[in-house]
Amino acid sequence: VVVTLSISGALLASCGAGDATSDARRSCVYVKRAIALEARSQRPGLSASRRRGLQGTALSELLKGTSSAAAATSIDGSWNPLMTTINEAERVPLLDLEASLTRLCRIADSQTPYL
């Protein structure tokens, strides 16, 4: 009975971690879109208006990933850096967060997504 409960507990824990990873990956879809839009906004020759428009769209796209990142964090607290970094974009330019977000999403998309 104890062995069965231990195995059941381990299986349930791994299911939760899988769900957290799925949520983190879902969030990273928005992160990647936002980073691509931010990169487009940095191209030479854009008007200031077009640059601001792309940056605004990038921020909006990034913030769409907040709920999935929060869901991942609720299941597995090790995804808190992803959620926190996304939320920082409201105060810190996305360009300054790009390296951290890219690294976190690389981890989420890896075969061994552990922080």
For the regions a language model picked out, list residue spans one by one.
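Bacterial signal peptide processing site
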Residues: 16-18
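Bacterial N-terminal signal peptides
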Residues: 2-10
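Extracytosolic low-complexity repeat regions of secreted or lipid-anchored proteins
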Residues: 29, 54-115
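Non-transmembrane, amphipathic alpha-helical segments
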Residues: 20-23, 47, 51-54, 89-93
